[in-house]
């Protein structure tokens, strides 16, 4: 498994029109961001000290990574590639460490609110409705829901598929498990009832919600980013989260545990799409042009979308309204200052077409 040193420098968060808030909010944002930056730096240092500089692996939007056993063992689910890799450095209890990690990973639920991905705490909750149920088949071709079947499969893997490699001075023992080919569709289907509920509540297309979830997290409920965006729809507490709470008449911003709850995350992400659609970008008349603007704004902020067309917001809306949807799409995917935002519109738009079928 290819390892990459995680980027730990926290880039400034790209927020929507909510960026024009007072100094108090900005000070709170900087305080929280600096604290998260320090936490990430300490966490990466712990991993580097134990695994080595070339083996630093940290959770991301589409990668679940959990360390246990004093950082000696880790579980990595690559939700994009559809693979699970369980590894350990333990020289004396390698088989036992791997066995426990395999069982726990196969049976964990999708509520990440009580799991700390930035520590070695053994806090993973086994669920009667495992996140990976139906996405992993054991050696007999059966889905895994209960501990007995997970334990039997773990024993099979350790007997038949145990691998050994060296990295620097370390010997690393590992087992790799492939998810079923349609794992992405299975995760999407799992969240469809929650998506439908949010779609009806906020008037946002189901296909758009699903496309954003796929692009943001590949339907990983444990998703985190280096800018501390959280959960399935990668909601940032200090910007989108604060706007959503304001819309709901609540003070402050959602907690991390709030955004790690799948239902609340999907609700918050969809509510923010409705804010972009009906408030920040309400003046855009053509529904297709507005959809392109909303998608791009979800990634890079409504203000940056409008500035692509003019520094004056009212004039920007007028320019957009005088353009065809195709020209709006072309402009946003070629002239937006953020390469990530340019690519984001293309990815979400393509994914949405698949969910409309």
Swiss-Prot record:
Q: Which Pfam families does this chain map to? A: Mltc_N, SLT
Give the catalytic activity.
Exolytic cleavage of the (1->4)-beta-glycosidic linkage between N-acetylmuramic acid (MurNAc) and N-acetylglucosamine (GlcNAc) residues in peptidoglycan, from either the reducing or the non-reducing ends of the peptidoglycan chains, with concomitant formation of a 1,6-anhydrobond in the MurNAc residue
- Spell out the GO cellular component terms annotated for this protein, sorted alphabetically and separated by semicolons: cell outer membrane
Where in the cell does this protein reside?
Answer: Cell outer membrane
**Lipid modification (N-palmitoyl cysteine), residues:** 17
Instruction: Report the Gene3D superfamilies cross-referenced here.
Output: 1.10.530.10
The task this protein performs is described as: Murein-degrading enzyme. May play a role in recycling of muropeptides during cell elongation and/or cell division.
What protein name applies here? Membrane-bound lytic murein transglycosylase C
Organism, per UniProt? Pectobacterium atrosepticum (strain SCRI 1043 / ATCC BAA-672)
């Amino acid at each position: 498994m290819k390892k990459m040193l995680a980027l730990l420098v926290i880039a400034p968060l790209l927020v929507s029109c909510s960026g024009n808030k007072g100094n108090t909010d900005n000070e709170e944002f900087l305080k929280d961001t600096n604290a998260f930056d320090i936490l990430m730096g300490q966490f990466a240092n712990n991993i580097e000290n134990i695994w080595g500089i070339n083996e630093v692996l940290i959770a991301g939007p589409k990668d679940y990574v959990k360390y246990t056993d004093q950082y000696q063992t880790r579980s990595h689910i690559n939700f994009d590639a559809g693979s699970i890799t369980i590894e350990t450095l333990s020289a004396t209890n390698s088989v036992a460490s791997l066995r426990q990690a395999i069982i726990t990973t196969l049976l964990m639920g999708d509520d990440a609110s009580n799991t700390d991905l930035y520590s070695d705490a053994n806090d993973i909750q086994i669920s009667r409705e495992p996140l990976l149920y139906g996405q992993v088949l054991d050696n007999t071709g059966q889905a895994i829901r209960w501990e007995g079947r997970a334990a039997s499969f773990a024993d099979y893997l350790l007997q038949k598929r145990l691998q050994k490699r060296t990295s620097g001075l370390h010997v690393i023992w590992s087992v790799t498990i492939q998810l079923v080919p349609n794992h992405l569709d299975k995760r999407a289907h799992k969240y469809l009832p929650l998506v439908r509920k949010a779609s009806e509540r906020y008037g946002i297309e189901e296909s758009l919600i699903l496309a954003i979830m796929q692009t943001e997290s590949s339907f990983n409920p444990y998703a985190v980013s280096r800018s501390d965006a959280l959960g399935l729809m990668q909601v940032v507490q200090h910007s989108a989260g604060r706007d959503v709470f304001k819309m709901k008449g609540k003070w402050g911003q959602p907690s991390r545990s709030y955004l790690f709850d799948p239902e609340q995350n999907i609700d918050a992400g969809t509510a923010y799409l409705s804010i972009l659609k009906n408030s920040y970008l309400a003046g855009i008349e053509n529904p297709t042009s507005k959809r392109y603007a909303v998608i791009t704004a979800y990634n890079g902020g409504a203000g940056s979308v409008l500035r692509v067309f003019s520094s004056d917001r009212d004039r920007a809306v007028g320019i957009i309204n005088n353009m065809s949807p195709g020209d709006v799409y072309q402009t946003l995917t070629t002239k937006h200052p953020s390469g990530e935002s340019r690519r984001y519109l293309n990815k979400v738009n393509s994914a949405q077409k698949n969910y409309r079928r």
